[in-house]
Amino acid sequence: MIIKTKYHGEIRIDEGQIISFENGLPGFNDETQFVVLPLSEDSPFLALQSVKQEHIAFIVASPFIFFKGYEFDIDHATLELLHIEDIEDVEVMAILTLEEPFENTTANLKAPIIVNKKEMKAKQIILHDASYETKHLIGGGSC
């Protein structure tokens, strides 16, 4: 299928690449289908692109690249909703807020996106750990 994207123009994707968010993302409840696209070949940054709306795309990255001590438990309800049976099937992404200069870019560690790569289902969860905030400098590297 061909989709229009914010950062890559018009591209062809395989329907198997589509990640389903049953309830959408907070603030974007109607957007339930996304695809993850690399921003460039060697970059850790990805675009979480809506399949329906070309202007809706979030820059995301694995939080573990920038925050080595980042850890949390996934609640039972989320494990069930996403049909997660094996931790190896889980991918975690953090939404980034890009800033100028780039070293002021932040990651939302309070609300990671949990993806079941096997089932292609995802959910953004809200952590209740007070040490995680919505804006952690990615250049800082610690939690």
From Swiss-Prot:
Location of the protein in the cell: Cytoplasm
GO cellular component, one term: cytoplasm
Gene Ontology BP, a term: regulation of translation
Transmembrane spans: none
InterPro entries in the cross-refs: Flagellar_assembly_factor_FliW, Flagellar_assmbl_FliW_dom_sf
Top-level taxon in the UniProt lineage: Bacteria
Keywords assigned by UniProt, alphabetized: Bacterial flagellum biogenesis, Chaperone, Cytoplasm, Translation regulation
Function: Acts as an anti-CsrA protein, binds CsrA and prevents it from repressing translation of its target genes, one of which is flagellin. Binds to flagellin and participates in the assembly of the flagellum.
Family: Belongs to the FliW family.
NCBIfam families, sorted: PRK13285.1-1
Quaternary organization: Interacts with translational regulator CsrA and flagellin(s).
Protein name from the UniProt record: Flagellar assembly factor FliW
Lineage, uppermost ranks: Bacteria, Bacillati, Bacillota, Bacilli, Bacillales
